[in-house]
From Swiss-Prot:
This is Tetracenomycin F2 cyclase. Homodimer. Pfam families: Cyclase_polyket (PF04673). The keyword Cell inner membrane does not apply. It catalyses: tetracenomycin F2 + H(+) = tetracenomycin F1 + H2O. The gene is tcmI. It comes from Streptomyces glaucescens.
Length: 109
């Protein structure tokens, strides 16, 4: 995978099953592949929710374009009742994207 995006939000740990179920259903639709998502991994740590998206290339533009798609709106509405922004100044999707500040790759990779 050449591209990764890590989104960070807040979530009550008790709601993890609901969020996972929403994405499990969503990932059976055509939309993730249309956007270019190759892998999705959800993490939780106390009240933090981390959403790792992996793709072959940068998908953020396609992700923004998909916001008007009914399947995107459906999953967003479902998980939106369980997730809240981490940052108080959150305005849009990109405001929850973690910034890479160090990366290492083994020489033989």
């Amino acid at each position: 995978m050449a591209y990764r995006a890590l989104m960070v939000l807040r979530m009550d740990p008790a709601d993890a099953e609901h969020v996972a179920a929403a994405f499990a259903e969503h990932d059976t639709t055509e939309l993730p592949l249309e956007i270019g998502v190759r892998r999705r991994v959800l993490f939780r740590f106390h009240d933090l929710y981390m959403h790792l998206i992996e793709a072959d290339d940068d998908i953020m533009e396609r992700l923004y374009q998909a916001r008007s798609h009914p399947l995107f709106q459906e999953v967003n509405e479902r998980v939106g009742q369980y997730l809240t922004p981490y940052a108080q100044d959150w305005e849009e999707l990109k405001d929850s994207k973690a910034e890479v500040f160090y990366s290492w790759t083994a020489p033989d990779s």
